[in-house]
Amino acid sequence: MPETLTDYVCTACGCLCDDHALTVEGRRITRVEPPCPVAAAFFLKERPAPPAAALIDGKPATLEAALARAAEILQAASAPLVFGCEQASVDAQRAAVALADRLGATIDPTDAAGRSQNHAALQTLGAVTSTLGEVAGRSDLIVYWNCDPAVTHPRHIERIARHPFTTPGDHPAARRVIVVAPNRNASTTLADEALTLRAGGDLAALAVVRAIVAAEKPADVKIDNEDQVERLTGAPLAQWAYLAQRLKLARYTAIFYAPDRSDPAGPNAIAQSITELVRDHHRHTRAVALTLGEPGNAPGAAQVLAWQTGFPSAVNFAAGFPQSLPGESTAATILERAEADAALIIAADPLDAATTSLSAAAQTHLRQIPAIVLDDHATSTAQQAAVAIFTPTFGIETTGEAFRCDNVVLPLQAAIPLRLPTTEELLHRLLALLN
């Protein structure tokens, strides 16, 4: 008999939409409403049962034997590395931090490809932010900077940018939506305006807009070479002056962007530039900046680590207390320098040749050390691991909490009954086996 679950939180993208209705038949989700291609791809995907509860050296094993072997490996290691953790609930992430603390390990939240989060701009400048609810209810101008939410976050424009105003006051007939992007994309067709940006011209364009916003009058901005502005940004100075004027005239502006982890320098620089622009903008009116967010619980991993240790990423417990050296104690750097002698990988697949972000040296070292993998299916990394233990699928079979892109915590339901121990339970059992 089909069962319908309502108000279901979807973790397929950073929006964490909490209004889905799922139709469940047995162990399969057969229908997702409201329609969303990203949610449908996540919920309706066929997920075959794992080959066994666990694998040891690629061969089926009992859960007890796998946990015992994993504990032996971690106990014998002098410099273990814990990474992944972004496809896990808050409680599982807390358990991972506790395990890293007990082991004197390094822990670094990464995405499935092994890319670490970049918090340097936040740590340097702070953040000027808000909740998505506040943006949806109060903002009269939304700028999507070099991103395509209609594809990556399909319901973002519907739920945020086109949401009716919910606060009293003399609001305009509708908020204005501007997309700044190198090419026309799915989002530009849904926006009120589309502005041109040269690929790689983010920093130059943001600097120009910031200079104009900071000036008392547009005439106060002195640009010696307007041709150079167009060459570096992909658009004439007049376009950026127009955008700056739009920002100044708005009562409440929200800028959304999507940093790319594949460029270690880019995300931090762009986040810093947008934050500086928003801070300058506050001389005129209210403005906030938010990332669109990533699938799973990436903000949760950073939040949990920060409230447990004071640092959001790349934390080392070897000294008996937490220390962080961003860029030095990231998972990718430690593996590339061959400094880890064991690895615990939680819901990540850094050895997938098609998606990995690790260098060849880092991949080689990861293959040479004993690795323990906790994941919901037999990934490339799990198949090469010393120990692989299979877990329920996060966001479908597990309950708990996850952080949305605006750092609001939302409760998770389980659409399908558990058939395996949760990641949190496995980490606690592993912790109990350590001497």
Segments from the language model and where they lie:
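N-terminal export/assembly segments and adjacent metallocofactor-ligating motifs
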Residues: M1-I212, P259-D260, A432-N435
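Non-catalytic alpha/beta scaffold blocks inside enzyme catalytic domains
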Residues: H119-H282, T309-N435
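Short, well-ordered coil loops that connect the C-terminus of an alpha-helix to the N-terminus
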Residues: A76, A105, R283-A287, Q368
